[in-house]
């Protein structure tokens, strides 16, 4: 049984009433709190921190970093969760697991299912425009300024604006040896590009797979693009706290000097560890579902809001509760045996039904058969008088 309550219910004059929350949990026999992104607003965050401090069981729910992925985390959220700790995933894989993981990675790279909408692949265009012999290419994918992981998991001097300033200064220092390609996040507001004269801002429609393929190294705060860099065997330098940041997988810069030192080094990652991490996310941590989005604008930024998820895999506390291969809806011709119980409805011959059958093809009827208006219309037309 699920009971929902807005965060405001537990606040009086903007002050969190802890006793009211505890009483509510007790009165309704609630033994676990579900948080959709506990950092989503300040009130929810206060409740989340209180729940953690009081050892109240909870589940954090949000989108994952792989295509179609979502997580139900009973330990924390994103970087603050211990479920990403290395002891959970750095385990030996057998040959079949390695092969399966590589095939999954190839399906991501060759596919067209991304966290954010991407343009068509056009690697040669990008290469012809920016490739220069003996120069390293640095790809910098930007994030939304007000995103949770920017607001809560960054540090000075690498806040959002400070990051761009440092990247611009670093690009000037390395102008003889490096080319910096920067891509704005599709949901971000406009950037004063003229302020960053040492950076090349590539088209917003550039596919990230092309950009990662072309570059020698990725530099980001804590973008999920860093995970794509890993699976494509490209070193990634994080300038903020990221849930996927571990020795051997990527590199972390805490200041501009460290960033510069990394960029002039020959960075390599341990791809065997990458496979272990991806295997863990895919098979032991993430749930998967096809999501349906609508774009909205609020508080000065664009949002992609999910209004429906068709789950085909659900994992909670390392247990799989659902795992199906196909969630595509199937349409049947009205002559199918599946409609045998409804023969009277299908063959009752009044003038309205004849018109209905004549004007509307079977495949259209099949597509709309689950809608409420269709059921009402059937009732009117087919019910015996």
Annotate the PLM regions.
Residues 2, 164-203:
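Catalytic donor nucleotide-activated moiety binding site of glycosyltransferases and closely related
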Residues 2-85:
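Active-site and donor-binding regions of nucleotide-sugar-utilizing enzymes
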Residues 97-109, 306-385:
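Membrane-proximal basic amphipathic "stem/tether" segments
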Residues 107-152, 156:
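Active-site cores of enzymes that catalyze phosphoryl transfer or operate on phosphate-rich substrates
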Residues 225-295:
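Catalytic binding pocket for nucleotide-activated donors in carbohydrate/polymer assembly enzymes
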């Amino acid at each position: 049984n699920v009971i929902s309550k807005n965060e405001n219910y537990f606040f009086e004059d903007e002050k969190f009433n802890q006793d009211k929350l505890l009483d509510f949990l007790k009165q309704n026999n609630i033994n676990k709190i579900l948080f959709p992104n506990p950092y989503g607003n300040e009130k929810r965050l206060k409740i989340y921190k209180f729940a953690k401090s009081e050892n109240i069981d909870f589940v954090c729910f949000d989108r994952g970093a792989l295509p179609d992925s979502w997580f139900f985390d009973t330990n924390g959220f994103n970087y603050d969760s211990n479920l990403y700790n290395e002891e959970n995933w750095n385990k030996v894989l057998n040959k079949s697991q390695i092969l399966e993981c590589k095939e999954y990675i190839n399906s991501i790279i060759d596919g067209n299912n991304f966290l954010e909408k991407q343009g068509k692949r056009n690697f040669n265009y990008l290469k012809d425009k920016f490739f220069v012999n003996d120069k390293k290419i640095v790809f910098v994918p930007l994030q939304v300024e007000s995103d949770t992981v920017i607001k809560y998991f960054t540090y000075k001097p690498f806040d959002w604006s400070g990051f761009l300033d440092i990247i611009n200064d670093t690009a000037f220092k390395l102008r003889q040896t490096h080319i910096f390609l920067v891509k704005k996040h599709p949901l971000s507001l406009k950037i004063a590009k003229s302020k960053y004269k040492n950076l090349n801002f590539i088209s917003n429609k550039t596919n990230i797979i092309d950009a990662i393929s072309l570059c020698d190294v990725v530099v980001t705060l804590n973008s999920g693009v860093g995970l794509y860099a890993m699976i494509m065997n490209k070193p990634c330098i994080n300038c903020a706290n990221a849930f996927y940041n571990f020795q051997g997988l990527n590199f972390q810069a805490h200041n501009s000097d460290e960033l510069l030192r990394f960029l002039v080094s020959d960075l390599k990652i341990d791809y065997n560890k990458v496979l272990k991490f991806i295997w863990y996310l895919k098979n032991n941590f993430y749930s998967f579902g096809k999501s349906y989005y609508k774009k909205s604008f609020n508080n000065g930024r664009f949002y992609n809001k999910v209004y429906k998820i068709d789950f085909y895999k659900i994992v909670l506390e390392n247990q799989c509760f659902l795992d199906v291969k196909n969630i595509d809806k199937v349409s049947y011709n009205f002559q199918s045996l599946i409609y045998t119980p409804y023969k009277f409805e299908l063959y009752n011959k009044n003038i309205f039904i004849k018109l209905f059958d004549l004007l509307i093809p079977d495949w259209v009827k099949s597509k709309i058969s689950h809608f409420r208006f269709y059921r009402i219309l059937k009732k009117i037309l087919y019910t015996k008088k």
